[in-house]
């Protein structure tokens, strides 16, 4: 691992020297030098967000790969953010864009849920199996992790995003026993939530006729995106019957691309452009593709790599011309992908020689840096990565790297599935 990091860092220093020696002209398609991020003792990690200060956030496995911790990477080094009340697992599972030092995510508590629930957090942490523990959203700043409470009567909450105004979004249980829940997993109703900087909490209602809602991202204008549907098992599926946009607390249906489940926005920029993934046919089977939504054009599929099964869009830049995500072809076939002006490219065709194989792209910042999860072909480990645009003329891959299908360890595969909340086969 250290030798590969040294090689990649050396390559980046060379890129900088080239950049200083000659003026840079923007190319139609960027190419990338890749650096693996530090690990915390385990064999897999995922960089899920990057802000405009270069703070990278995500999740990393601890020694033994049985527990995960919310992680901040600064200058490539991993900093564990800890857990609430010394609970076993935590994660930053969604892109966090705040530039003022605020990070949000989820943490399991040591306590078991009094109702025997398995709330929404479990697929994103640990081994991706039900734990029966209470889970709370958290707000982290200046080394301090603070709990984000549920609505009255509830036990658990989940935080996904925070804007530069300090508004945190996610979802939280209330005290209502919901008949649309699958009681083997979830009993209490949950609703989309905004936790304001002053500590107050606001509910964002579902669409008329739906039971539950959840918020997944917020921009600096206070526009919130998320899902509306039935309770189910409180993870995707029927809880995402509709992709929604809340403006001033009012929900608008964003439409669909043929499906009535898994309609999930993942990010919204300050121009109101939304990306995510959505089913292409009725039913809860995972037949989703990445989508882009604009006010002028509505929801449109971004497609997937030909022959693959599904795709997701995970992050978008402010200009809206670059989107990053994942194309998946099977249990061991994952590829980080980039859409530039909606044209899809396997990122492994854009990297310098000696780069690791890029499995998943989680987010992109305004300078074009992309973060995600890679496969180190020497060690078999799956560290987080940052990909940095390189000057034109730098030697890059002439073709897509040979796809390392069948070589992914179970820990690496599960870490990628944890990024999307699919680490367990119990998710329908």
Label for each model-derived stretch:
Residues 2-428:
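Residue-level hotspots at or immediately adjacent to binding/recognition sites across diverse folds
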